[in-house]
């Protein structure tokens, strides 16, 4: 650790910011618990860049029924989240990405529990720490993203699991 402290952080990239305040920020490399990140700056997303062309080809191959299924999945999930008494949905309208929190439950623990059920979500403040935590005063959030890869059964499973809250 003492050796790592001798080096300046020269590159900053994705995943390197621990916290953001109105007039300051904390880099992971400056946090004694995350000192190793000084040597792991965020990298250009080369894999994603290369895959973009293939993704566009795939997107162009989709049928209208695929688009209809996605729209139905989004509306079904939105209606469920909006009407659940313990869920606070941030979205004002249906969208492929929806953010929410559950009153009285830690979002990170709920995210882990959903993962155990085969449901992948993101938790936290999604790179807008200061705005969400300090200005909006939200607890850490859960974010669900739906896409063409999600089946109607996926959404039904998610709703079944969240219904137990």
Show the residue positions of the predicted features.
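Pyridoxal 5′-phosphate
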Residues: 1-165
């Amino acid at each position: 650790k003492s050796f790592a402290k001798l080096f300046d952080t020269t590159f900053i990239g994705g995943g390197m910011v621990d916290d953001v305040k109105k007039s300051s920020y904390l880099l992971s490399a400056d946090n004694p618990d995350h000192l190793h990140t000084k040597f792991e700056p965020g990298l250009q997303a080369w894999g994603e860049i290369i895959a973009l062309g293939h993704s566009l080809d795939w997107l162009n191959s989709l049928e209208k029924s695929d688009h209809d299924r996605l729209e139905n999945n989004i509306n079904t999930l939105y209606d469920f989240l909006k009407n659940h008494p313990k869920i606070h949905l941030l979205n004002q309208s249906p969208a492929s990405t929806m953010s929410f929190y559950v009153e009285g439950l830690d979002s990170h623990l709920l995210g882990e529990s959903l993962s155990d059920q085969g449901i992948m979500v993101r938790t936290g403040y999604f790179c807008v720490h200061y705005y969400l935590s300090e200005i909006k005063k939200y607890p850490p959030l859960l974010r669900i993203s739906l896409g063409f890869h999600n089946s109607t059964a996926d959404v039904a499973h998610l709703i079944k699991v969240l219904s137990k809250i």
